[in-house]
């Protein structure tokens, strides 16, 4: 098997200036002239104080960020970022998992996508990985409970090892861990580097003496420049050559960190021989290649749907809350509007009932907002690494919520419909259930879209509340279309409430189209004042609009799903840039 050596040639990175700012200000460099080399079976530790540029350098080495100048080479060949990501793995500082899945289930999901043609080997691969990471005894433990910080970090490392990368990059793998857990993590990384003959590069703030014994080479950074790059056991000699003697009570690295600001000349490693440019014959095609996924779309959707169902089933509290909420609210409304009749008072009450129904159904979906926001970093990590297609995630999410929200719609509709005494027709009832179902699906898509945009739960909740209030205000229930200022008229047509309210009104009064709802009685003369058709005419509605409103609601459902996909696609592309 071919072994790889990773190197960089004069990498610099400057913080991009805003194109909107017309200024002659020079760019601020975070990294300057970084030239390094990392060999297989060795750990290279990037060490430096906060703000030295460690994380930025790792992002560049992982091909997540493009350097301002310089190049990354693998066996002296300029890398193609897309191809390079297939043989490398990046482990971020913060662990992100689904807390309701077990360690084994988390590994099995990724392994099934990475080994679609060898599904029989998945269990053996997972078992072997659990053993290698000393996690066998925690295989059936849920990630949200019972795992220490060090064990969670090992799970993150395990996920990155499933496709057996040649280069493993880790951002602060010991951050937030106690000394023993930190040592255990680095010890496992050392074992991986030697047993698999892989390149391991990690950033670390200030390693302990025990951890230093596991590190082969160090790259000491200060203010974005290299102070020293080489073997750890040669650091003391380097310091001596600069006129610094290491005190007996300190090791060479501790002393180097203390006098970092006094080592004025950045270290230049004369032993690293890198070409200024790669010969054309050795250059890889720099054009971004199409990402080829290891699993088919059907396999991806199937596995993602299975994971979604498992998480929903295990979120029993939310599941039962949604079902009970729909049942209780439906029954309470049914008893409040019990047999409301069809007269003048009944017409007014129906408007109120339908308006409240829409408010309840659309606002209740905000319960899923924190779940979607918590899932987002996991989704970005998995899709940016090429584990599965983003579109497969959106489709699987849709397929799972279709039957789940249909159940909610049926429970709410049946508990309400007959108590209120709405139009008794199986066709009308079926249409009512259909509209309620599409409303909750549309609301789910709306929340999904906002969760892709919102930076956090508080901002997401505020956005949902403000926009739903605006949609309700411009629905025509409070202010008619004719009374709206022309410059606000567009909001009337963008209001989700409008089409949903119109659909419910048309369904009810089409059924009562020829029935007299309000009579004029004087002496022996009885004449009909208002029919169901008159109610529709007064509100500018017609029976032929019945399916138009359904199509509009479906359009909103699809639109918000597509917008969510585009926002997430932009985020995924940003994490690969």
From Swiss-Prot:
Pfam families: ABC2_membrane (PF01061), ABC2_membrane_7 (PF19055), ABC_tran (PF00005). Residues 299-509 form the ABC transmembrane type-2 domain. Residues 6-248 form the ABC transporter domain. It is found in: Membrane. Disulfide bonds: none annotated. It is a multi-pass membrane protein. GO terms for cellular component: membrane. InterPro entries: AAA+_ATPase, ABC2_TM, ABC_transporter-like_ATP-bd, ABC_transporter-like_CS, ABCG_dom, ABCG_transporters, P-loop_NTPase. The keyword ATP-binding applies. GO terms for molecular function: ABC-type transporter activity; ATP binding; ATP hydrolysis activity. Keywords: ATP-binding, Membrane, Nucleotide-binding, Transmembrane, Transmembrane helix, Transport. PROSITE patterns: ABC_TRANSPORTER_1, ABC_TRANSPORTER_2. Its main location: membrane. SUPFAM superfamilies: P-loop containing nucleoside triphosphate hydrolases. ATP binds at residues 48-55. The chain crosses the membrane at residues 318-338, 353-373, 400-420, 429-449, 458-478, 487-507, 548-568. Belongs to the ABC transporter superfamily. ABCG family. Eye pigment precursor importer (TC 3.A.1.204) subfamily. This is ABC transporter G family member 4. It comes from Arabidopsis thaliana. The gene is ABCG4.
